[in-house]
């Protein structure tokens, strides 16, 4: 449905996208994950035809049959929910009776059926996104694109929104969604990591985990400020990152199961041995490693 071939986009000297190659097929729920400034919104603006790439190509087979939920709420705040949907239907030439029936079904699906007369400007962030989703679905698209739809939304609304997306995908809709939240990737059938305009890796969650080439150890300690610098000095360790209340210790290339006794010896007398264990990498671990590898490769090319 969407194919990007060496896709690049620059704004002056800033490279928002750098040589992105990606294919998204019919029936997928694809999550594009990356921090602010990664290039996610630029990717969507090109996919929806709002801007042209600087070089490379993007082909969107559903350009005339797509729904789009932008990052910022783009409906009329001085119109009610019902009025916004009626206006959207009129703009796209949807029959009035058909539009009314679809709107009722959509609002019931997202839990807004009791609020049809409420002005959009009076809605909470989560309710605004549900309205934006309903507006995007009003034309029964073949492809749904959503640019960070849950950013700034409370946790309960986030969960409800993703439940709705999961139901839509189960019904056969192809969905492409961007998010800065790693935990939301579990909802997707396939994931892409985007960082500073570079597509670092793609795959299912399990494929990405299996592709992780390093040994990873978790250290649980209440004295992380003392533990972290000590580990960072060990040659067989190339990264020590804080994940919530624990440390993830990444072995250098070629370091395998011997990482655990190395960590235990380094932290002897400071951390109990049973507080040190090998773990499966999280998506954030995988993202960080791929970003580090891309930075190293770029440095080598520059040199």
Give, region by region, the residue ranges found by the protein language model.
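Conserved ABC ATPase signature
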Residues: 119-123
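Helix-to-loop junction immediately C-terminal to a conserved catalytic motif
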Residues: 48
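Catalytic Walker B motif of ABC-type/P-loop ATPase nucleotide-binding domains
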Residues: 144-147
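Conserved ABC ATPase "signature" region
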Residues: 86, 90, 97-115
């Amino acid at each position: 449905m969407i194919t990007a071939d060496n896709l690049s986009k620059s704004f002056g000297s800033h490279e928002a996208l750098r040589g992105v190659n990606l294919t998204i097929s019919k029936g997928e729920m694809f999550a594009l994950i990356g921090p602010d400034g990664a290039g996610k919104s630029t990717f969507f603006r090109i996919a929806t035809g709002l801007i042209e790439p600087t070089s490379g190509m993007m082909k969107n087979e559903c350009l005339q049959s797509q729904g789009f939920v932008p990052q910022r709420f783009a409906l009329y705040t001085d119109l009610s929910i019902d009025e916004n949907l009626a206006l959207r239907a009129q703009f796209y030439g949807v029959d009035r009776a058909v539009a009314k029936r679809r709107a009722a079904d959509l609002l019931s699906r997202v839990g807004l059926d009791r609020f049809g007369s409420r002005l959009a400007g009076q809605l909470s962030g989560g309710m605004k996104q549900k309205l934006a989703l309903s507006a995007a679905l009003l034309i029964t698209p073949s492809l749904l694109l959503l640019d960070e739809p849950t950013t700034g939304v409370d946790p309960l609304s986030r969960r409800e929104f993703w439940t709705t997306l999961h139901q839509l995908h189960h019904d056969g809709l192809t969905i492409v969604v961007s998010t800065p939240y790693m935990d939301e990737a579990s909802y997707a059938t396939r994931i892409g990591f985007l960082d500073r305009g570079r597509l670092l890796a793609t795959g299912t969650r399990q494929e990405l985990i299996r592709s992780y080439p390093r040994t990873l150890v978790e250290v649980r300690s209440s004295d992380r400020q003392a533990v972290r610098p000590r580990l960072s000095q060990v040659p067989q360790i190339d990264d020590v990152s804080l994940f919530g209340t624990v440390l993830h210790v990444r072995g250098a290339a070629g370091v395998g199961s011997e990482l655990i006794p190395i960590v235990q010896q380094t932290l002897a007398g400071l951390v109990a041995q049973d507080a040190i264990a090998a773990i499966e990498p999280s998506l954030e671990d995988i993202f960080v490693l791929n970003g580090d590898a891309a930075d190293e490769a770029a440095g080598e090319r520059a040199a």
